């Protein structure tokens, strides 16, 4: 609730798009749930995305808010933020981005602090107003064959995917008492679906993104 309140305090409306540019980490999942609790739509961006890919996804999705992981990520996106004249610094850009916060620069703490004036009831209203048919996320391809292509996924789509995993033998990993290490990019549908299944199924999840330390001897 506290992080969702921060988004609401920043003027995020029901159905607004919020971009999330980060490698796999705990804050990624926290922000994803907070975006949904605020009634908004998450727009994951691969941490390895190029400048042109980031610009395209921000413009195409209509994201009004973004959370990055590192200073390098923020630098790639900063020229897309609207200036005082209501236009982005990047000439010719159609970006609608109003603000960027950075995970490594206390984004979570900032959102919690800014959301303090918001009542729990306002978050409850956003949650109750969200229907299964509503858009939950715009998921883009990695862009290996051209511009990243966006896929519109509703809350019903995610619930169906999670139900399929939990009713499959693979669903055993999501049972209470199980422990799962999530290390694949959460911008990828399968990794995110498994992550959601673990959360809903009652398992315990850890996040990691340093592939060099995941080798098996």
Predicted regions mapped to residue ranges:
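Short beta->alpha connector loops at strand-helix junctions that form conserved
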Residues: 45-47, 69, 209
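Conserved structural elements of the adenylate-forming
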Residues: 1-2, 132, 151-172
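Conserved AMP-binding/adenylate-forming
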Residues: 3-49, 183
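Short hydrophobic alpha-helices that are characteristic scaffold elements of the AMP-binding
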Residues: 32-38, 60, 188, 199-200
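Conserved pre-ATP/AMP-binding loop-to-beta segment of ANL
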Residues: 118-140, 147, 173-179
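ANL superfamily adenylate-forming
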Residues: 72-132
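Conserved AMP-binding/adenylation subdomain of ANL enzymes
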Residues: 159-179, 186-217
């Amino acid at each position: 609730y506290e992080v969702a309140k921060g988004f609401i305090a920043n003027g995020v409306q029901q159905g607004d798009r919020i971009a999330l540019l980060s490698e796999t980490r705990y804050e990624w999942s926290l922000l994803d749930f907070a975006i949904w609790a605020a009634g908004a739509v998450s727009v994951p961006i691969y941490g390895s995305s190029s400048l042109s890919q980031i610009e395209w996804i921000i413009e195409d999705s209509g994201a009004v808010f973004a959370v990055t992981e590192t200073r390098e990520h923020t630098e790639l996106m900063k020229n897309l933020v609207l200036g005082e004249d209501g236009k982005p610094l990047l000439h010719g850009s159609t970006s609608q981005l109003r603000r960027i916060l950075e995970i490594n620069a206390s984004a979570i703490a900032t959102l919690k602090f800014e959301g303090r004036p918001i009542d729990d009831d306002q978050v409850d209203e956003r949650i109750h107003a969200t229907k299964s048919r509503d858009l939950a996320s715009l998921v883009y391809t990695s862009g290996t064959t051209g511009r990243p292509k966006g896929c519109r996924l509703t809350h019903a789509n995610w619930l169906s995917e999670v139900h399929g995993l939990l009713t499959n033998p693979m669903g055993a990993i999501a049972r209470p008492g199980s422990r799962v290490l999530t290390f694949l990019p959460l911008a990828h549908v399968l990794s995110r679906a498994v992550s959601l299944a673990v959360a809903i199924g009652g398992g315990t999840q850890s996040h990691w993104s340093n592939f060099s330390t995941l080798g098996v001897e």
